[in-house]
Structure formats: structure tokens, C-alpha cells
Amino acid sequence: QKEWDQFYNSFYEQKERSDLIVLGTVEDYTCFAGGLEIATDISLQVDEVLKGNIETGENITVRKRGGAVTVEEYLKSMEDAGITYWNAEDLKAEYSEEERRENYVQISFCDLDPVIGQKSLYFLKKDAEQDIYYRLCDGLGQYIETSPGEYVNAYEIASEKRDENEPMMLALGETVENDPDAAPEESINIYTMDEIKEEMETYTAPPTDYPGAEEEPE
């Protein structure tokens, strides 16, 4: 269970469901293909531990869905898995053997690409079999430090960049600002670490005013 299909309404819920909460810096990352899927392993240096049995300065691996591999690697991954996919022959016809080594297949799930040196707060789940971690609900479990002491959810940034057809990454030094004239549903939430830590200790009841929400018992 990678917690991809879960949604959390508060920092308190994220804290309760996380195995590990750390402030960490991306040291390196590697993309790889498996069948039709592409994933990215991020080597993360732990700068601060907010929850979990781990030491500051350790390195952990955080795996995320999506990434980019060469056309050659992607085709080989399908062949090794015994998968015959509709676009495999199209890829072979479109690219020569040399071009397959120079061109890439990218898969994105409205998520940001990692950037070496970037610092984020991560809410993580431990894999049951491997010594790796997954973010709680993908990008919703990551808050990027967009300026000193300020954090923005990675999914919110990715959604805005997708809507603007911008590259799916936040470059080092690139800041995020809130538009004071934006509608509430379009505004970006910017948190300080003190606000996050305080909300992690404060239970907030889930919203009940959306379609399909269970009615309060009488």
C-alpha cells in the first residue's frame, strides 16, 4: 500500500498516518522503468527529524511515480516484462537505434521533478519489503521550501505549472507568491514551519460540506 489513493485534510492527519516526517535535501536521483511504469528514486539527506526513528545526517531513498528514461530503456523494460503495448512498434518505427538512446519517454502524474539541492518537508510511509519510503499521497505529502522558512505543497505548485504549460519543476531560487486578488480556490497556501508544527498537533474534523460526505448523526 503506497497511500496513493488516500487524501488527508490536515497536517494532523498526515502526521498520524506517516511513519517518518523529515526535512530533507535532495542529493541525487535516478529514474528507471519497470514494464510500462517509470519511477524515480530520490537520495535524500535528512536535515531534521520531526517524527520517526532516524538520525539527522542519514540518507534515505524516497521513491516517486513518474520520471524520464530513454526510449531504448523503456522499450527494453516492456520486452523484459513480456508486455506488448500499442505504442511499442510506433516508438521503434519513429526512432533509429541511435535516436532511441538520445530521446526520452517521460511520465508525469501532476508532480514536480526533483531538483538537486532542493529542501522539502516530507511526510513518508515505509515500504513493507524494501528499505525505501513513499510520500504520503504523492506530491500532497511534500512541502517545498520556496524561500527561507516558507513551505508550499508540491502538488499545488505542480498544478499551477501544468495549467501554465511550464516545466514541471521548481528551480533552485525560484519563489512562489500568492496573488492577493486570486479567488480562494485558486490561492496557494504558504506555511511557516511553526505553523506546520502547530497544526500537526491540532486535530481538525474532516469537512462535511462536499457532495457525498456522510451526514452528521442526529
Language-model segments: residues:
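Short glycine/threonine/proline-enriched tight-turn/helix- or strand-capping micro-motif at secondary-structure
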Residues: Q1-F11
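Extracellular/periplasmic catalytic domains that process cell-envelope and extracellular macromolecules
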Residues: K15-E16, L36, I54-E55, D113-I116
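Netrin-like (NTR/C345C) domain of secreted extracellular proteins
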Residues: Q1, V71-E218
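Short edge-strand/loop segments of extracellular domains
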Residues: Q45-G52
